Structure formats: C-alpha cells, structure tokens
Amino acid sequence: TIIERDGRFLLVEEYADGDDLVYNQPAGHLDEQETLAAAAIRETLEETAWEVDVNAIIGVYYWTHPRGETYVRTCFAGTALHHHPDQPLDHGIQRAVWLAREEIALLGPRLRSPMVLRCIDDYLAGKRYPLEFFSYL
C-alpha cells in the first residue's frame, strides 16, 4: 500500500529471508473471506501502527525472484488517518519509516523487490484505478 504524506512514503524495515534487513511497502497476505482492500488496510496497521484508508488501485505487478518464486502484488493508494505509536508491530518488522522517493531509490539492493520503487513511480505518474476494478463473487 502506498501511503504518501508531505512527499514522503510510508515503508517498513523488515527482516526477509533470515538475516537480510530490507525495505518494503506495508504488504501481506489475505485472510479468509477478506477483500484485497481490507487486507491492505489491516496489514498496514499491523506492520506500521498507522490506520489508513485506501482509495484507489495503483496497479497489479508480477515479478519472479531470482530464486524462482513468483509474486503477484496488488498495490493500493491510501491516506494515513491515525498513528498508534504504542501498538507493537508484526513479527519481523523493525520499524516504520517515512522516506522521500530519492531516499528510497538510494536503497537499491536493500529494497525487498523492484516492485517497491515501481509502485511509487506509478503512483507519482498518477496511475489510479477504481477499487471497483475487483469483483468479489
């Protein structure tokens, strides 16, 4: 989920693949019977302690890790509503940080995947699709 405030983007610093400390947007998996938008809101709260609302889809991204795992990411645009500084963060999350696009680009190999910067660039380019893009049957 892309949350932008005053030109800075909300990211998490997290452990991935053991000891590697990387940066990523708040992200995660669906719970049973959960919509994609609801999962984005829940995961952002759990990983950053920020309540957010989502208002658009930025895109759907398909990426294959060099190890062979394939990921499909749905990226949302949202708004920060309220911070809960005393809330513990999910296991593996070290901290939530606000960084400018230029600072994020300098992280290079410390980004969890190329999708991190691509989602931000698509957001900055104005790509937005309605939440109704997804149909739930």
Model-predicted regions and their roles:
Residues 13-14, 42-46, 97:
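Short, cationic motifs built from Arg/Lys/His that form the positively charged side of catalytic pockets
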Residues 62-85, 97, 119-126:
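Active-site-adjacent beta-strand/loop module that shapes the phosphate/pyrophosphate-binding cleft
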Residues 25-57, 76:
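The catalytic Nudix box helix
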Residues 1-25, 52-56:
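N-terminal strand-loop-strand
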Residues 4-9, 17-19, 31-32, 77-84:
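Short, charged/polar surface micro-motifs in flexible loops or helix N-caps
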Residues 18-23, 91-137:
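Nudix hydrolase/Nudix homology domain
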Residues 12, 33, 107:
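Residues that scaffold the ATP/ADP-binding catalytic core of kinase and kinase-like folds
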